[in-house]
Amino acid sequence: MYANEWDIEGIIANRPVAREGENTHRERTGIGIVRSLLRAYGECHPQLVQHDPRYPTMEALLQRTVAGGVGNAAAELVLAALESKDPRPVWFLNWGTDYGSNPSALKLALDQVHDQRGAAEYARLKSRLRLSSDDRFGEHTWDVPPAFPLWVDTFRPEREGGRWYHRFSALTATAGGFDIERDVRTGHGPLGAMYPVNTDRPQKEGDSMTFLYLVPTGMNHPEHPGWGSWGGRYGLREEKGGSRPYYWANVADAWHGTVKRDHVLARWAVALQNDFKARLDWCVAPFEQANHPPLVTVAGEAIRHVKPGERIGLDATATTDPESDALSFEWYVYPEAGSYEGPPVELHSSEPARVVFTAPELDETRELHVVLAVTDAGEPALTRYARLIFRGPQADH
């Protein structure tokens, strides 16, 4: 449902056969399950492109779908992405690679480069990678330099109710009145009907935050895990001494009067589930009968250098909605995402789309983050964001 948001270089089905007792899909091979889902997606594609023409065709995705552990197809798919002339980082999202599955295709690809091409080429290709994944990469994780440039571990640590992986379903399953049968499996086309509740863990959602971290909502920045996103917010793994850019779910947010790790995800739960609901509607409804997210625009630069005591005005009056729905504007300081530790900054507003505040004392090492959440009055109500970052005056060099 989010294939329109990224350029998908490949899909790897890494489990040869579904686990008995856990997944009761009539197709038993991993690659067979993935292909059946893609065929269902293909049936929905004519509707989906009415809502966003960036949705890739079923054929394009099938051409880039391989089974892990079969020859070198999966590793070669990874290497093709790393060797492309496209200068953008390559994000590798890995889940389900544990007991009973094939080794990670990324590990196999890096094994090949390390053993056959030398240290310089290994370092060059590894520098292109960004990871949102559990650790399935063997010696490439900690032992073979250089480090991965950025790694977001959506699995650990265990605290406040278990592994972070296990908190997603608990925090989001019914957020905003979401109902998996009504909103996904019934009346939403062949892809929704295949949503895998046919397991012994209905609505198993621990892996979703792996890619939700990358959904471009206007709030998140993939290179900054500490800023927060629909996948949660992450902190640097301290016991490694900061030697490697490894982030995990060890941080907490203040929300509704308490401070908890769960809040880094719970605060967005209704918005992300409503977004999923809307996309299932897109599978069956024409553009004019479905809702689409607002287009948030704040005048000026997203990152600004300000002087202490300076009066700052923020203007989002250029924000629009595809259906011309009424819009609500919520402005707030996000203290945990920034590094400013001084007195609270108060935002003042005489109209919903504008706020003013007085810049606090900031230096080059401190940031103040202000987030704007805009929600439309459609069904389901959809939310998008803008993040404004304020830093102290630039030093003269």
Predicted segments, located by residue:
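Surface-exposed, flexible coil segments in extracellular/virion-facing regions
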Residues: 332-358
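Short, solvent-exposed loop/turn segments at the edges of extracellular beta-sandwich modules
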Residues: 374-381
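Extracellular interdomain linker/stem segments of modular secreted and single-pass surface proteins
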Residues: 391-397
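N-terminal acidic, glycine/proline-rich low-complexity segments
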Residues: 1-313, 319-341, 365
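Short, surface-exposed loop/turn segments at beta-strand-coil junctions that are enriched for proline
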Residues: 358-364
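Exposed beta-strand face motif in extracellular beta-rich ectodomains
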Residues: 364-370
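Extracellular and select intracellular beta-sandwich modules with Ser/Thr-enriched
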Residues: 381-387
